[in-house]
Amino acid sequence: LGDGGLTNYQLSITLNSQTDKEYLGYVKSLIRKLFHIQLTVMLRKNENTARIVVSGRNLVELLKGYGLKVGNKVKQSVNIPAWVLKKNEFAIACLRGLMDTDGSCYMYAHNVNKKRYYNFALCFTNASVPLLRSFYAILKKNGYYPSVTDRRVYMHRKNEIAEYFKKVGTHNNKHLHKYQKFVVQKILPGR
């Protein structure tokens, strides 16, 4: 659903080879643990990408059985499978995975009455409208107040972001490091 894709014979997951190095290790370990299967990592240095590839028709059929689709996710308007949405524990885990792959954390500045303020935000970006709506709905169901645009879901409230990192968490240390630096340690950008 996030940075992955299915063909008739392969599962592939593409990550940033520079900023997602630690997360790449986590994903590789998770695939081996869940499927007991061999995988390949292809690095494209000129694109800063690392592509995890797992070949096997049986794996693809298994994933299709869980509700994932072969082909272009946007054209097919992919969504979180219904069985995941029915159980909040699964929905939260899916939310975490989507944010880990298609999400970002950042500081932004704005001025009010000539005074500069800094805020931290979470942003999930995806071109599949049903997937975006489900992501938004899971956040709302769990007491958050996100905002949404045509391709993004944002969280800006400081207390909600703190709660998100406690309740939902992240397996992508890139996000955790930014949260700790900007929110916990209160280090402003460029310092």
Language-model regions, residue ranges each:
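Internal intein/HINT superfamily modules and their associated LAGLIDADG
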Residues: 1-191
